[in-house]
Amino acid sequence: MKKILLLFIQLLSILSVDAQLKKMPAYPLITHDPYFSIWTVNDKLNERSTSHWTGAEQSLIGLIKVDNITYRFLGDIQNPTETIVPFGEGNPTDCLYTETDPGADWMINSFNDKSWQTGKMPFGKGWGNDAATPWKSKSIWVRRNFNLTDLDIEKLILQLRHDDDVEVYINSKLAYSCKDCSVGSIKEYAINDSIKKTLKKENNILAIHCINPRGYAWVDAGLGKQKKPKALTKAEQLSVNVTATQTTYTFKCGGVGLTVNFLSPLIASDLDLLSRPISYIDFNVESKDGKPHQTEITFAVSGDIAKNERKQLVKITNGQQEGVKYLKSGVEGQKILGKSGDDVRIDWGYAWLASANPQNILSVSSTKKMIAASEGRILNETGSEENQQQFMTSSIKLNIAKNKKSSSTVMLGYDDLYSIQYFEKNLEPWWKKLHGSMENLLNQASKDYPQILTKCNEFDKQLFDDAVKAGGNEYAELCVAAYRQSLAAHKLVRGENDEVLFPQKENFSNGSIWTVDVTYPSAPLSLVYNPVLLKGMVEPIIQYSESGKWTKPFPSHDLGTYPLANGQTYPEDMPVEEAGNMILLTAAICKADKNIAFAKKHWETLSRWVEFLVKDGLDPANQLCTDDFAGHLARNANLSMKAIAGIGAYAQMAAEMGDKQKAGNYYSIAKQYASKWINMADEGDHFALTFDKKGTWSQKYNLVWDKLLGLNLFPQSVYDKEVAYYITKQNEFGLPLDSRKTYTKSDWVMWTATLANNQKDFQTLIHPIYKYLTQTTSRVPLSDWHETTNGKQVGMQARSVVGGYFIKMLEYKWLTK
């Protein structure tokens, strides 16, 4: 009987581990920080090149030769692009332009453009002010006449950089367009053959319309051509499975089964492990047909992961320390911390490919050599490899007997040398003091791999099981999808006094560092797994005020533009938003710590902020809140609710410090404000968006802290009324943010759902978000801002705010478990 029971328990354990996530908009492969973050946006691993979260290509390639037949299981390989119509960056190009609407036929070849101005691409403002021609209006139309010496073009490539929305025509035909989009560097897009056929030797027209509704502006374009590679044999992908720390694929390669596992060991409770910028890629081969096989696995990493722009040159060197061989790749002529901004990638420090297996051969390859290898041949030609990608390559032969297995593991890491600048001082990553050098870290990481794999397997199972208990299977899968993405939008840095600093980058929503209203939605993940990380997000903002560098009576919005944290760079404040956020986050830290010390340390600053909330929080003036994409809003009921909860949280902390008089005073104010709020916002069967606009509604996600902190400011009837109303307002892919638009923020939906007092209503509210996760056609790292009618991304992606999905787990931990 005991044996049967033990077998049953083991079976349940296996089922639990396997019951993870099979479908995502994009799949995390290598995820550590905002600069070291590689994804695939296809369900099949070998359908497309891998990319950085920004969409810039950062190619990983995997090939397996089985008995002299080569299969590609990872990434894609394209021939180098040869420029045929140069873009303007670095060599401005002549064209015609107008900033006045030219009418409907402006893109037609025969259009009369004689009244247009002469200028040079690129056009723009901002972005370092290095545009050839300034562009400051809302729209620009550009026409460029070009000739071609050769029409032998196998594959036509559009080379384009735009900020923001753009439409591009070639010889009167639409070649490319996108809305609510921008890119910060030249990117390449394959153009279909029907447009290629319109090309002629003389008088072709490239016509572009770009709009600039906000912020910086840029447009630059050219054309290139590629030779089409030979049709390659692809491994047959059988499955993909995502857990909190791992993404695993299985393939059929003739008579051999191949399993590839990407492990980024982001264990939030283990600062040493969390800070290590090293992922493990494990290859396991197994005979599936009862026969012995000779196999050879090649894994290649493009030098692009160490540069921001294609034109930058990288240098690859090799070495060995103890039993670990390595290659490292970095840009020549580096400037450490030399770039800041949103759509940018790192171009300082070094990418490392390493192996402790003596049979593993590490070498440097070019694009042409990789294509030759994928075709099962050796490249004999010599000559210039200029403009080709350079690859760090690992190859190993694994011979397997019939019905047997064999495996090999490589490590891919990144040493950024210095991670951020913190008030003019360059700071190293957390791991540097512990391990000294990347060589030392790689050796330690190699030795630790068996224990790390076990630890990650156990953590993945525990996270999933806890999430199922908190909110059900769909909720658990949402948490799995959010975990790595949220943590990898941060960087764990050591302060000058050994303090933990955990800044995040505001990915594709401004590029700011230490944004308070990004920390606020991200916080639940850290509160569940390691509140020390939340302190590393919150305390620098407090210290900015305490230093005297920030003198306003409310907190700053941010500390700069990633990775430079030298003071706020966002052009507008969010007074009530950030004051409420900081007080609520401090109270949450104290609850998680079961200790009031953190608040006590900064009590004077918190007291100044709560006075601001008392004065300005009940009925907020016209101002931005965290949902700044929706614009300024006065008399915002949800923002008022945040202020009221913040005042109540301050009272709670005062009580824990033994100051009964202050606690009573502020709790009384919060209760009075809550009562007034109910009267001002009441719309009968729900509460309004603003106090002065009838017939409106909004998600009151800020109410969740009244529940989680046990403030008891609002009666249960407020929760019940709002939740019941929300259920009537849902669309196919979620509950809209409010009555103004049909888009939503999925992190806020998760908070709103947690207001429900039963699992049925909670799951009813999150199910459309699960549907969005698994059915959206927007193939990018999970966007938290999407359209509820069609499930498409509106903007923003790969942000840390999906850590807010863990709010239900936080409720389970604090109020249920």
Where are these regions (language model features)?
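Well-ordered alpha-helical scaffold segments within catalytic/enzyme domains
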Residues: I38-N42, G62-V66, F251, D282-K288, ...
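Long, well-ordered core segments of solenoidal/helical folds
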Residues: I305-A306, S486-R494, P531-K552, K591, ...
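Carboxylate/His-rich catalytic cores and anion/metal-binding grooves
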Residues: G55-T81, D101-P102, D165, K227-A235, ...
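Extended ligand-binding clefts on enzyme/binding-domain cores
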Residues: G323-R377, E506-V518, P524-P531, W550, ...
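Beta-strand-rich ligand-recognition modules
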Residues: R161, E167-G224
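Acidic/polar, glycine-enriched structural segments that form the non-catalytic walls/loops
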Residues: Q20-P28, S37-I38, Q78-I108, L206, ...
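Aromatic-lined ligand-binding clefts that engage carbohydrates, nucleic acids, or primary amines
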Residues: W116, K138, F146-S172, L206-I208
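Aromatic-rich carbohydrate-recognition surfaces in CAZymes
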Residues: S437-I452, G511-P620, N636-A654
